[in-house]
Amino acid sequence: VVKLAQEMGLVKLGTVAIDGTKIKANASRHKAMSYERMQQAEGELKAQIEALLERAKSTDAAEADEPEVDIPAEIQRREDRLKAITEARQRIEQRQRDADIERGRSPDDERKPRDDEGNPKGGRYKREFGVPEPKAQDNFTDPDSRIMKRAGGGFDASYNAQTVVDEQVKIIVAAELSNNAADVGQLVPMLEAVKVNTGKAPEQALADAGYRSEDNFQALAGSGTELVVAMGREGKRCAEVDAQKTPHTAAMAAKLQTDAGKAAY
């Protein structure tokens, strides 16, 4: 559809606007479980299975008057539940390992932050490598979804839908779904998706403060697309930017003070 619109001359790719919105997943938040609760539930289910196995071995006359209990079925039900919880726990742990590696951590870092040369920077990570936070969650009906905050308040199992819209003709030129609630990691891949879909980069891209990061600005510095990204929420004063530590962010802040920057924003 995008290519057809482009062939018809409808897609201009002068200025595009990037934004994200949370879409509720087809999954109940009541079907989610925290990492801490998973660990507790695994222990409880293992104990129940062991007790049922012992009961099957030692059935006596005292149970003759009790309603018949299908012990194999009860064991199977608990084993199925245990398997589902164990798989969910392992998914959370794998996600945490992947996230830690992306942040520059390693399994043997001894919880000590290090610089690019491997030298300790001081301080200490609050948890071991790959160990999730107790409140980290996984959903049994839609494991790919994540608990995200709703715009009106509260939380749901959701996805973060990203769109890039041609500002002149209001045509969506790229759309993707992410299970990361934060927008900041989507700026580079969404602009790359525009190039994949249309064969060219937009001249200018507008985005709100959720996409602001020094890494984003640096990665897109030579992309051929002029970025105009807000420094903070409208009407709120932003902290001073250190031009020595974050030169690209400082340049963006300066651009937003110009007439051209204000007009674009």
How should each PLM-predicted stretch be described?
Residues 1-265:
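Anion-binding and metal-coordination hotspots
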